[in-house]
Amino acid sequence: MQIIEIREPGQAESKQEVKIAVGIDFGTTNSLIAISVGRKVKIIQTEDNKELIPTTIEFTNNNITVGSNKGLRSIKRLFGKTLNEILNTPALFSLVKDYIDLQSQEVKLNFANKQMRIAEIAAEVFIYLKQQAEKELTTEVTQAVITVPAHFNDAARGQVMLAARLAGLEVLRLIAEPTAAAYAYGLNKNQTGCYLVYDLGGGTFDVSILNITEGVFQVIATSGDNMLGGDDIDKIIADYFCNKFSLLDNLDTLRLAKKAKEALLNQDNFEFNNISLDKQTFEQLITPIIGRTINIAKECLEIAGNPNIDGIILVGGVTHITLIKEELYKAFKVNILSDIDPDKAIVYGAALQAENLTTPNIDSLLIDVVPLSLGMELYGGIVEKIIMRNTPIPISVVKEFTTYADNQTGIQFHILQGEREMVADCRTLARFELKGLPPMKAGSIRAEVTFSIDADGILSVSAYEKISNTSHIVEVKPDYGIDTSEVDKVLENAYKNAKLDHAARLLQETVIEAESLIFNIEHAIKELVDLLSENEKHIISSLLNNIKHAIDARDRALINNAVKDFKSKTKKSLNTKINIVISDLLKGKNINQIK
């Protein structure tokens, strides 16, 4: 919202302070920084005229150097990761094996003659980008819009924001990388419709489905594979060279493969020291990889409800390969948008959004989505989903829960992430307790729970109880990050176990209802002890034992039959007496009562 300063008549107009806002693409391999003025984007160059700045940090001669292609690489992959996760993931451990402090309880690297956290090291990249922008623009740069992968969770996003703040940058907004690319095309081309963003980088593949309508960008589905990218193409070519020309499987061959890949972007043949590769063979080699990306894109469309797409936006340097455009067109028969250099599309969108947030009367809005469902634990270990996967953000959802036991003075809240039905199969995000509640009958206390996700994708959960005026709020920062492959694994397990999960949930709900019936009947019998004959007590006890045995057998049909048998055999002779007491006990209770 624009703030307008109101002055007294005749008061001199002071010169407005100008704050420079830039867009930053903090990439795994390379980073870029750009500024937009009048919706015209300019990418900031280094002193040696480079736009793509290697995301590397090196410490030599008591100085930290960024962009030297040496030292610590791919630090972006470490955002949001725990020490255990890094140690147990070879691909991550190999990045930091020469730096990591194994004695620490958290992720710390021995770097620059001291222990540094990931955010502190990443801040050096932001500092370097900021300095390059200030040199070229000859003014201080204080604000930025920064892009992050669509699947970055709260912990990873939080570390990006911390790194930027340590570099002296105010983060105006974090936006998903595919959203940024779509934003660049939406404003530059004035597009409206539904678009598929195809982002194939060096080591990862991301695909998103976006609606773009009247300046509103909404991600409606995301998918991808974080182990698929240009590096795989290099490996396939290297293997071909090893088999065809008896080369050694080493780094030199891999570099030669990369050189061949880049050469074949603009020519039909590659030759080097009697090693050759023609474009036709090259395309035959990489067709399986391109096919995998297209299958993932089709699956993402299914998740989105199979909308008709109006175009495909290309992102990532690998999409310079002509065959990718051709195969995408064959598969989807829509326009391929590649007017903006795929290497630069993301930073273009970030720069345009930075201008949008600092310039009056630009009304475009970006909306990302929740990658995995968020919910709470209910009584019995059941998961109640509060915000569903692929829900657009920002979002706020309010639900009411109640106590399940008499004289309960606290409610425990267990916040979860995942698509499964039971707590044991989902990821714990946070736990907290609302204490100091007045001791009252079960169901009398009502707690209002609010799940809120802001525009940066940060989740906060609050609980409020009106009678005691007690409240608690927690900003959820998961213990470890979640990337594309983990999201895909969660979804795959959810689909694979859908029937079993549904059956498990129905069984648990049936058990809870049966246990509630047993509790209330036994409580009622104590109140009716003088009204019931010994024969009636025996019948009730026997029927309740049948229900208990069925519960122990974990057989839903058996439980339902035992409950049905109890109700039918006690309906006429006992219903009136029992209802005198249990009608009050059951008031306000339902299956969704939580711990």
From Swiss-Prot:
Matching NCBIfam families: PRK01433.1
The entry's keywords: ATP-binding, Chaperone, Nucleotide-binding
Chaperone keyword on record: yes
PANTHER family: HEAT SHOCK PROTEIN 70KDA
The family this protein is said to belong to: Belongs to the heat shock protein 70 family.
Listed name of the protein: Chaperone protein HscA homolog
GO molecular function: ATP binding; ATP-dependent protein folding chaperone
InterPro entries registered for this protein in UniProt: ATPase_NBD, Heat_shock_70_CS, HSP70_C_sf, HSP70_peptide-bd_sf, Hsp_70_fam
PROSITE patterns assigned to the protein according to its UniProt record, in alphabetical order: HSP70_2 (PS00329)
Role of this protein: Chaperone involved in the maturation of iron-sulfur cluster-containing proteins. Has a low intrinsic ATPase activity which is markedly stimulated by HscB.
Classification via SUPFAM superfamilies: Actin-like ATPase domain (SSF53067), Heat shock protein 70kD (HSP70), C-terminal subdomain (SSF100934), Heat shock protein 70kD (HSP70), peptide-binding domain (SSF100920)
